[in-house]
Amino acid sequence: MSFLELTEVWGKPQKDIFFPSGSEVEESTDAPIQRTVQPIVTGSSVLALKFADGVMIAADNLASYGSLARFYDVERLTKVGDNTIVGAGGDISDYQQIQRLLEKLEIKEGNYGDGYALQPSYIHEYLSKVLYARRNKLDPYWNQLIVAGVDGENKEPYVAFADLRGTTYSAPAIATGFAMHLALPMLRKATDDDRWKTLSKESARATIDECMRVLFYRDARSLNKFSVATITPEGIEFQTDQSVSSKWAFAEKQYGYGTQTV
């Protein structure tokens, strides 16, 4: 076999090896259309918790291209209406499409002019139906979403989750991505057994900061630059370009770090 024959497939899509260009399988239009079967540019953790006066939600600004930390200024929290924030982990392009859907929903609701405003529970139900419908088409939006806000006439704190399969639930503390393993125990420690009802805004922020610090230390898909949104009956306070202090002296004692003599 010549060198040219060996290198013929270099640089070609893998499907050409099994289904040569022009084959019956490749040109078939009966197969389902799938776009985001394997996400390329992704965001990792989003975390949210209730406190006495409202809800706090945070997400870092990193979008990773595979395992490469590629984009450092991606906002993964979106304001919807007057008292709702939607945070997204997973595929960034799918998240951008969800943002467009939410913008259309806001415009449509505003056109009614009936005095009613979008509530967090309405938005969560809408997103859960959208995600479940796309899952049934075998072309899901590859995201995990957290909807946070103050809901209803009494402005009750509201935090709920929805993912690409249409799975939904609500809890005092929720996280996505690697934060489900690293940060959620700390969030639950602050909120379980109705402790969130006496949790101050300052304590909630301290918990969020500690979670973001742990994620920065331990999650390779995280960044020490994040946004925090606080939703209370008075409105939304959106803080960007936040960071936490970090100390790496402990790394010298970790096996495999730097030049060590074993």
Swiss-Prot record:
Pfam families assigned to the protein according to its UniProt record, in alphabetical order? Proteasome (PF00227)
The SS bond pairs are none
Localized where?
Answer: Cytoplasm; Nucleus
Q: Does the keyword Acetylation apply?
A: no
The answer to whether UniProt assigns keyword Cytoplasm to this entry is yes
Chief location bin: cytoplasm
Spell out the PROSITE patterns in the cross-references: PROTEASOME_BETA_1, PROTEASOME_BETA_2
Q: Which Gene3D superfamilies match?
A: Glutamine Phosphoribosylpyrophosphate, subunit 1, domain 1
Q: Which keywords does the record carry?
A: Cytoplasm, Nucleus, Proteasome
GO CC terms in record: cytosol; nucleus; proteasome core complex, beta-subunit complex
One GO biological-process annotation of the entry reads: proteasome-mediated ubiquitin-dependent protein catabolic process
Task: Cite the InterPro entries for this sequence.
Answer: Ntn_hydrolases_N, Proteasome_beta4, Proteasome_bsu_CS, Proteasome_sua/b, Proteasome_suB-type
Query: From which domain of life does this come?
Result: Eukaryota
Stated family: Belongs to the peptidase T1B family.
On subunit structure and binding partners, the annotation says: The 26S proteasome consists of a 20S proteasome core and two 19S regulatory subunits. The 20S proteasome core is composed of 28 subunits that are arranged in four stacked rings, resulting in a barrel-shaped structure. The two end rings are each formed by seven alpha subunits, and the two central rings are each formed by seven beta subunits. The catalytic chamber with the active sites is on the inside of the barrel.
Q: Describe the task this protein carries out.
A: Non-catalytic component of the proteasome, a multicatalytic proteinase complex which is characterized by its ability to cleave peptides with Arg, Phe, Tyr, Leu, and Glu adjacent to the leaving group at neutral or slightly basic pH. The proteasome has an ATP-dependent proteolytic activity.
State what protein this is by name: Probable proteasome subunit beta type-7
- Specify the species: Schizosaccharomyces pombe (strain 972 / ATCC 24843)
